[in-house]
């Protein structure tokens, strides 16, 4: 259980691919103009990560070390092609919106990196969990950034959700505030850099505060009974 918990925590927070490793920044910065686009690409990447980790881990004993990278890329490309066709068939609006960034998942350093660093060394179940955790960590970062940019830029949240979830999802659209002229800077790439920088700073502050609390708790436990540590 401790290993499973560690894989989940590493993927979602401690080793977050977007906020710690800073991998996959091209789609992270380009697609997060709305929450729907961010969520769509994040879920697609999560599905690819999970399936490729599972497949590569299952075949790891039969994969020659000398040609493992080309084999990994072929597996990743096959899974991405299948996911691309699924999105094209069932979420065509999202497919048009994401465009080239769906097939570019093949070259995403996150996918190849987890295949080499984790799936090639661990069992299928744990590798699939690692892929899912890493993917969800990236999805959460993309969703937060996309939501902030959409709210600041358009005053809405989940605008165009029907492109991802179907016509019923139109009810998910929220108008946070009304604006006649959208704040274009929030929808352009510079705001993605600014937003990502603020998220990195926020994670750093949270980590430092948690580290300080753990140190204080450890110091209190180390004191003899009856002492408070106050002079």
From Swiss-Prot:
GO CC annotations, alphabetized: plasma membrane
Compartment annotation: Cell inner membrane
Residues that span the membrane, as ranges: 18-38, 39-59, 63-83, 86-106, 125-145, 182-202
Membrane topology of the entry: Multi-pass membrane protein
EC number(s) recorded for this UniProt protein: 7.-.-.-
Keywords, alphabetical: Cell inner membrane, Cell membrane, Electron transport, Membrane, Translocase, Transmembrane, Transmembrane helix, Transport
GO biological process per UniProt: electron transport chain
Chief localisation class: membrane
NCBIfam families referenced in this protein's UniProt entry, alphabetically: PRK12405.1, rnfE
Subunit structure: The complex is composed of six subunits: RsxA, RsxB, RsxC, RsxD, RsxE and RsxG.
Protein name: Ion-translocating oxidoreductase complex subunit E
Phylogenetic classification of the source organism: Bacteria, Pseudomonadati, Pseudomonadota, Gammaproteobacteria, Enterobacterales
Gene symbol of the encoding locus: rsxE
């Amino acid at each position: 259980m401790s290993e499973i918990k560690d894989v989940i925590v590493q993927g979602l927070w401690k080793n977050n691919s977007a906020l710690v490793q800073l991998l996959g920044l091209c789609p992270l910065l380009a697609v997060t103009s709305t929450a729907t686009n961010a969520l769509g690409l994040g879920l697609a990447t999560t599905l690819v990560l999970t399936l490729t980790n599972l497949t590569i881990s299952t075949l790891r004993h039969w994969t020659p070390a000398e040609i493992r990278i080309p084999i990994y890329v072929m597996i990743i490309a096959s899974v991405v092609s299948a996911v691309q066709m699924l999105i094209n068939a069932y979420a065509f609006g999202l497919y048009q919106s994401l465009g080239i960034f769906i097939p570019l998942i093949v070259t995403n350093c996150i996918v190849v990196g987890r295949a080499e660093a984790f799936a090639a060394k661990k069992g299928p179940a744990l590798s699939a969990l690692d892929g899912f955790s890493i993917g969800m960590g990236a999805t959460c970062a993309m969703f937060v950034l996309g939501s902030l940019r959409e709210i600041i830029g358009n005053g809405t949240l989940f605008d165009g959700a029907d492109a991802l979830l179907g016509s019923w999802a139109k009810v998910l659209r929220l108008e946070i505030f009304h604006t006649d002229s959208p704040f274009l800077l929030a929808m352009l790439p510079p705001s993605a850099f600014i937003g990502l920088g603020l998220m990195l700073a926020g994670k750093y502050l949270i980590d430092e505060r948690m580290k300080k609390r753990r140190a204080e708790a450890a110091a209190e436990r180390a004191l003899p009974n009856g002492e408070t540590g106050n002079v």
